[in-house]
Amino acid sequence: MNIQRAKEIVESPDMKKVTYNGVPIYIQHVNEETGTARIYPLDEPQEEHEVQLNSLKED
């Protein structure tokens, strides 16, 4: 996923279907400098991770 699209998803009031390794996730924050995003699985909000944007897929 590119940085611009990830930022659009974060700012959107609508929930978008995004996955990381096949797991549905929520994007909390996009770091443009490092090309990463802070995410968590929808069913485990306490499990935050910092991942590369190119590993995220929009369904």
UniProtKB/Swiss-Prot annotation:
Name under which the protein is recorded: Small, acid-soluble spore protein H
Similarity field: Belongs to the SspH family.
Induction remark: Expressed only in the forespore compartment of sporulating cells. Disappears after 45 minutes of spore germination. Expression is sigma G-dependent.
Taxonomy of the source species: Bacteria, Bacillati, Bacillota, Bacilli, Bacillales
InterPro entries tied to this protein: SASP_SspH
Predominant place of localization: other
HAMAP family named among the record's database cross-references: SspH (MF_00667)
GO biological process, one term: sporulation resulting in formation of a cellular spore
Location in the cell: Spore core
Top-level lineage group: Bacteria
GO cellular component terms attached to this protein's record: endospore-forming forespore
Keywords: Sporulation
